[in-house]
Amino acid sequence: MSEHDMQNTNPPLPPMPPEITQLLSGLDAAQWAWLSGYAWAKAGNGASAGLPALQTALPTAEPFSVTVLSASQTGNAKSVADKAADSLEAAGIQVSRAELKDYKAKNIAGERRLLLVTSTQGEGEPPEEAVVLHKLLNGKKAPKLDKLQFAVLGLGDSSYPNFCRAGKDFDKRFEELGAKRLLERVDADLDFAAAADGWTDNIAALLKEEAAKNRATPAPQTTPPAGLQTAPDGRYCKADPFPAALLANQKITARQSDKDVRHIEIDLSGSDLHYLPGDALGVWFDNDPALVREILDLLGIDQATEIQAGGKTLPVASALLSHFELTQNTPAFVKGYAPFADDDELDRIAADNAVLQGFVQSTPIADVLHRFPAKLTAEQFAGLLRPLAPRLYSISSSQAEVGDEVHLTVGAVRFEHEGRARAGGASGFLADRLEEDGTVRVFVERNDGFRLPEDSRKPIVMIGSGTGVAPFRAFVQQRAAENAEGKNWLFFGNPHFARDFLYQTEWQQFAKDGFLHRYDFAWSRDQEEKIYVQDKIREQAEGLWQWLQEGAHIYVCGDAAKMAKDVEAALLDVIIGAGHLDEEGAEEYLDMLREEKRYQRDVY
């Protein structure tokens, strides 16, 4: 090609008018980004304007986007992440929003900006949907994350020793793998709204500024999807619960049992509340009036003394009854109360975190007052307490079977401390204080991480102990109502066959009707050698492996600290023994089941 061939034969562009130059000098980064895109679009259609059509695209800047992930056990982390995503989009930032149950863990290596909102379960473990990512980040194949910027919001309960542990672990591990922190981690307690809003506002402001520096094109402002604007299951929700009526409260353990388990039936007529097997019911409750009187007497406070609670001025007795947490002690309460008590022993307890955690777990608030008397005003005492929070119970019914009812399987918490009888807040309310036709405020808490297979022909294996059998009653009711072809296998454990066989006649009827195809029961105290569900799982290794090869889905419900861990260890033994895999292969197989949503757990 000659020099002449390389010369531009297009006419020279005219000089830019000075007023245009002046206008352009005043544009900010976002306006420049918009204008460049606009000019590019016009250039692409520029033949009519006498401009040459460009044959090759100019390189464009990588779009400024943020991935917002949530790992939720009860739905709180999901709702906070949804709100954060909406806030970022309103600020003109492009957002990719996902729940970790729908997110491929290996994609983390390609992320550039990541926000994670996570709760904590059990003894500091990540929520079920975050397990695969947590294992990847802490395993041999952990990716380098040196191109990632991140921020973490942890949700937890400070009455437990490993407060917000999952959030802390993710935050630390991201940094260890080379990622750069956008914002310091925030750990939010049960009353998380203010902390979560502050974190969201700060991260939105920071990213908006970062987007401007990068001259990124802002995403168009959008309104939240309809599902985020209103409660998905009718207008009633956590903030506006439905005043339901108690239909039945039946003890379903024998008189001789050490356990007091109640079958609770609640009327949802007129609520338009809908739920699916696997969902939970949120229950708001009032504290025991006797406990309120005991506390006020110990403090020497008149019940009629008025304080602020719930945005109102109320007698302190009413406020403690309905607005403050009295049955779950916290480190914050003990640390705040200690200066009023002026007791060296309590000061030593409050100063040692390990001792403090043990003390909080074993000593109810009222018994702190008994042991370490103090005088403080009603306002001062209320200022040490957390707001009352609802309790969540796995729903033990299917609406396909019970219609406008919802059933719960509630273990009443009862114990003695220093000779004084104590009871759980919500379980005591449901079992002892709520009368038939009495009102209980409820809402549905979705649990999309604990769902029956979409294909009802798939077999399911249900593993539960104690009240962990609750969702499986709902599962089998649903399968029976649909006349589902899929086989159902139940593993259930409790101390005694004669005293603790929850829903015995119903399981027998399901088996007779062809909807419970296999069942294995473990009665831990009916013989000298204790037998648990994990032992039954190992006994049935070949059968379980065969069901897995047929596409079975496995569900586990129960105690996270002990039972769920022991069951997972047993499942790994099954995969190693019957599946002929080594330990690493078994772990990978179980992770594959998790990612395929064929291994789901509802643990607490």
Curated annotation (Swiss-Prot):
Enzyme type, top EC level: oxidoreductase
Designated name of the protein: Sulfite reductase [NADPH] flavoprotein alpha-component
InterPro entries given in the database record: CysJ, CysJ-like_FAD-binding, CysJ_Proteobact, FAD-bd_FR_type, Flavdoxin-like, Flavodoxin/NO_synth, Flavoprot_Pyr_Nucl_cyt_Rdtase, Flavoprotein-like_sf
Catalytic activity: hydrogen sulfide + 3 NADP(+) + 3 H2O = sulfite + 3 NADPH + 4 H(+)
Gene that encodes it: cysJ
CDD domains: SiR
Keyword Disulfide bond: no
Pathway: Sulfur metabolism; hydrogen sulfide biosynthesis; hydrogen sulfide from sulfite (NADPH route): step 1/1
Phylogenetic classification of the source organism: Bacteria, Pseudomonadati, Pseudomonadota, Betaproteobacteria, Neisseriales
Keyword tags: Amino-acid biosynthesis, Cysteine biosynthesis, Electron transport, FAD, Flavoprotein, FMN, NADP, Oxidoreductase, Transport
Positions that bind FMN: 72-77, 119-122, 155-164
Cofactor binding description: Binds 1 FAD per subunit.
Cofactor(s) needed for function: FAD; FMN
PANTHER family: NADPH OXIDOREDUCTASE A (PTHR19384:SF128), NITRIC OXIDE SYNTHASE-RELATED (PTHR19384)
